């Protein structure tokens, strides 16, 4: 079964790998472990955005090192980048001060990843690029794209992998209702599916702080 993987990069990061030693994740090994053997992984599409490094100048360096590691080690890997937008917003204070009820702060938002993922999921269905699509996210904004695939391509299968390293927690009901199967990406799989510290045939190394 031709299977394409669609990864919501920031949902994966915040749901499963942030604060863990498992950031050097081998995507192909991960889905080979999670999925049954009849799945032939033909593409791994990763939707994310480049971090700014405003708070940590080395953060974009580590991120790009990881991207290069995946590109060098995984022929099926494809990278699709959205953007970060920072703009001032004015919000009410939770505990107003005398003469001050509002504060203006800088708000940073990631734009494009969920839309890009949804567009690729639908377009690939129309192009007959997969028999099964596996969505790695718990973002309910993707529900409509999944619903349309089910409606217009009833022979195609949809899987949902929700990133959750701890036991407990639940997949989005809006997403799971459109999935033929639902899997959890937990700490055991994360620990077992790390890239080599040095990518063979390259000079790419796992960042020391990871």
Residue locations for each model-derived region?
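Domain-level signal for Mg2+-assisted phosphodiester chemistry and nucleotide/NA-binding surfaces
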Residues: 1-108, 161-167
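Nuclease catalytic cores that cleave nucleic-acid phosphodiester bonds
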Residues: 81-210
């Amino acid at each position: 079964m031709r299977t394409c993987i669609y990864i919501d990069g920031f949902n994966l990061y915040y749901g499963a790998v942030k604060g863990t030693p498992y950031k050097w994740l081998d995507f192909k090994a991960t889905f080979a472990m999670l999925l049954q053997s009849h799945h032939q992984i033909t593409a791994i599409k990763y939707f994310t955005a480049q971090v700014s490094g405003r708070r940590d100048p080395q953060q974009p360096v580590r991120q790009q090192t990881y991207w290069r590691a995946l590109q060098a080690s995984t022929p099926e890997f494809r990278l699709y980048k959205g953007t970060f937008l920072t703009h001032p917003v004015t919000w009410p204070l939770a505990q107003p001060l005398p003469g001050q009820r509002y504060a203006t702060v800088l708000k940073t938002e990631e734009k494009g990843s969920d839309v890009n993922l949804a567009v690729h999921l639908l377009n690939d269905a129309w192009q007959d690029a997969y028999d099964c699509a596996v969505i790695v996210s718990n973002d309910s904004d993707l529900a409509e794209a999944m619903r349309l695939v089910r409606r217009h391509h009833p022979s195609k299968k949809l899987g949902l992998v929700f990133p959750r390293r701890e036991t407990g927690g639940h997949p989005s009901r809006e997403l799971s209702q459109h999935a033929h199967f639902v899997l959890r990406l937990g700490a055991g799989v994360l620990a077992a599916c790390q890239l080599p510290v040095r990518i063979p045939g390259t000079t790419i190394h796992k960042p020391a702080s990871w």
